[in-house]
A protein has these predicted regions:
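Bacterial N-terminal signal peptides
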Residues: 15-26
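Segments that shape or occlude catalytic/ligand-binding pockets
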Residues: 32-271
Length: 271
């Protein structure tokens, strides 16, 4: 069976929507945080009434909504370019900085896409220029330039190394050794990065500066197979493997009519 290949634009839209859903659809029931404060509360912030859902561990907002008001109203929105629209995130952080507890320059653009008349924009949080794994801040902008709510997974008080003690080459060898029959399977490194990897515990968070690698066997590149790959995170200070995870592919056996093997830079990494 032959099917058309999904476009890069469609993939980008799906990734942005997934990020927004992951941050906005969280913990629907109220509760108490670790310090006794409610996880959901209504506050007055600089004269504006807001509904906030707090992360019980980080005490950073998961969701902020304006009550009978917008978080931000962008003037002449219809005339703005995509690049100008991507500057909205830092403006939003600057306005609600004491709630979000990060700096505007800690944002790094993840994606911005227009669907119908609505823009969907998302960012990573960074620490000294390094992305925090699975961090996010996302929101939508309606045709009038109004932002009604935001969703976020942020880490206000990151304590992590700012340099690496072991080399990239050492970390890569450690990562490769985690995969049985690495050479026999003709595994390839299809994505890599340096990340800050937060590990949540009961009452605290450990932060690791890691080399993140995504490996895939050669046969996994063909869309007719469900063969997956592996994500390996190696601590840049000790060489310890702090994450080893199987990367699954969606089930299916349809080969696009114009299929060609993807280039490494076209493969979506796990972060």
């Amino acid at each position: 069976m032959l099917v058309p290949r999904i476009s890069q634009r469609a993939k980008l839209i799906l990734s942005i929507l997934s990020a927004l859903l992951a941050t906005l659809i969280l913990f629907s029931s109220p509760g108490l945080g670790s310090n006794g404060k409610p996880d959901d509360e209504t506050i007055r912030y600089k004269g504006q009434r807001l509904s906030i859902k707090w992360d019980p561990l980080t005490r950073a907002p998961l969701i902020i909504r304006g009550i009978e008001s917008n978080l931000l109203e962008i003037k002449n929105f219809s005339k703005l370019s995509r690049k100008e629209i991507t500057h909205t995130g830092p403006l939003l952080v600057n306005k609600y900085q004491s709630l979000l507890q990060i700096e505007p320059d800690q944002l790094q653009l993840k994606g911005a896409e227009k669907i119908s008349d609505t823009w969907y924009v998302s960012y990573w949080q960074t620490f000294h220029g390094v992305i925090l794994y699975e961090s996010s801040l996302g929101f939508s902008i309606d045709p009038r330039g109004h932002i009604k709510s935001l969703g976020a997974l942020l880490y206000p008080t990151v304590q992590a190394p700012v340099t690496s003690k072991i080399s990239h080459e050492e970390a890569l060898k450690i990562g490769q050794k985690q995969i049985k029959d690495y050479k026999k399977l003709k595994c390839m490194l299809l994505a890599e990065s340096v990340l800050i990897y937060p590990v949540k515990k009961t009452n605290s968070i450990d932060y690791y500066r890691v080399y993140a690698f995504n490996f895939f066997p050669e046969k996994a590149l063909h869309p007719a197979t469900t063969e997956g790959g592996w994500a390996v995170f190696v601590d840049s200070q000790t060489g310890k493997v702090v994450l080893f995870e199987i990367l699954m592919k969606p089930l299916g056996c349809c080969v696009p009519e114009d299929w060609v093997p993807p280039k490494p830079e076209e493969m979506k990494p796990k972060w």
